[in-house]
Amino acid sequence: IACAPRGQLCFSDKLCCIGLRCKSRVANMWPTFCLV
């Protein structure tokens, strides 16, 4: 895949589409998703 869209599970920022960051929805907790 070219990049992971918003809401996609991820392990690092570089897997996410341009402008998205790999972040948890709850601070410092897994799982992490491509979010703003």
UniProtKB/Swiss-Prot annotation:
Q: Which GO terms describe its molecular function?
A: ion channel inhibitor activity; toxin activity
Q: Does the keyword Plastid apply?
A: no
Superkingdom, taxonomy of origin: Eukaryota
Subcellular location per the Swiss-Prot or TrEMBL entry: Secreted
What tissue specificity does the UniProt entry give?
A: Expressed by the venom gland.
Q: Which UniProt keywords apply?
A: Disulfide bond, Knottin, Neurotoxin, Secreted, Toxin
**Which InterPro entries does this chain map to?**
Huwentoxin-1
- Record's signal peptide: none
Major location (coarse): secreted
Please give the positions of the paired cysteines in each disulfide bond: 3-17, 10-22, 16-34
Q: Provide the domain comment.
A: The presence of a 'disulfide through disulfide knot' structurally defines this protein as a knottin.
Q: What does this protein do?
A: Neurotoxin. Causes spastic paralysis and death in mice. Does not inhibit L-type calcium channels.
Please give the family membership noted in the entry. Belongs to the neurotoxin 10 (Hwtx-1) family. 53 (PNTx27C4) subfamily.
Its protein name is U6-ctenitoxin-Pk1a
